[in-house]
Design a protein with these regions (language model features):
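Residue-level recognition of well-ordered beta-strand positions that form the cores
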Residues: 70-72, 82
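Cap/lid segment of the alpha/beta-hydrolase catalytic domain
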Residues: 100-216
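Proline/glycine-enriched tight loop/beta-turn segments at coil->beta junctions
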Residues: 76-79, 86-96, 102-105
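Conserved, well-structured beta-alpha core segment at the onset of a catalytic domain
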Residues: 57-61, 88-91, 140
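Mature, folded catalytic cores of secreted/periplasmic enzymes
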Residues: 81, 91, 209-212
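Catalytic micro-motifs at enzyme active sites that drive phosphoryl/nucleotidyl and oxygen chemistry
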Residues: 84-85, 137
Length: 216
């Protein structure tokens, strides 16, 4: 264990904590360890099925057949998702759940890695160039023979928090956007997205991280 040097007069805190007990408990593979991990992380111990699953429409473009689906996680807004398959595919396919990145970009979720029925937002296209080599990788996987489920995760896209629901202090800080969060093309639309992404980052750091630590 590397020594701690940035805690000032509390630099010996780490040493005392390690003296009282091992930093990492011994965890042998098996059901007991899996159960302990669930308890520590606050996972639900029972089944967690998607609720009220709905099909919202279908499309086909560029060799991919898509279906828009949505479901309830039991709290918050409905989760919007796309199920992508090779066009014309029949029968069962190997499946992949494709997850988008964090990227400090919460305005969109699934759109960052997948093309849906409409052309991608230019802001998303620019982001893909930086993060994914310009590709919608979920569609690439579908064209190669996979059934790919792409959904908005908690805090992104359809599951994002509206700015008006954020505390006043977060909105005040967000009004003074850090220059590092400037959009690339300078359009009004890009400015709106950059404003939201900065506010959402502040909200995650100052508020949501704390709730997640408490709720699991």
């Amino acid at each position: 264990m590397l020594p701690v040097f940035h805690l000032g007069p509390f630099n010996d805190w780490q040493e005392e904590a390690m003296r009282q007990r091992a930093l990492f408990p011994v965890a042998y593979p098996g059901p007991q360890t899996r159960q302990r991990v669930k308890e520590v992380l606050g996972f639900c111990c029972g089944p967690e099925p998607a609720l009220d699953v709905r099909s919202e429409g279908t499309w086909e473009r560029d060799g991919v057949a898509g279906e828009a689906v949505s479901w309830s996680a039991g709290y918050g807004p409905r989760t919007q998702a796309w199920l992508l398959k090779p066009a014309g595919a029949q029968g069962r396919l190997p499946g992949i759940v494709a997850l988008h990145d964090h990227g400090g970009f919460k305005f969109y979720g699934r759109e960052k890695i997948a093309d849906g029925p409409e052309p991608a937002d230019p802001v998303v296209t620019a982001f893909r160039e930086r993060a994914y080599g310009g590709r919608a990788y979920a569609n690439e996987l579908a064209r190669r023979g996979f059934a790919v489920l792409v959904h908005d995760t908690f805090m992104w896209g359809s599951r994002r928090f509206p700015v008006e629901s954020m505390p006043e202090n977060i909105r005040r800080m967000a009004a003074q956007r850090d220059p590092a969060w400037q959009p690339t093309d300078g359009s009004a639309h890009a400015e709106e997205i950059a404003d939201y992404n900065y506010a959402a980052w502040l909200f995650e750091f100052h508020v949501i991280e704390k709730y997640c630590a408490l709720f699991g």
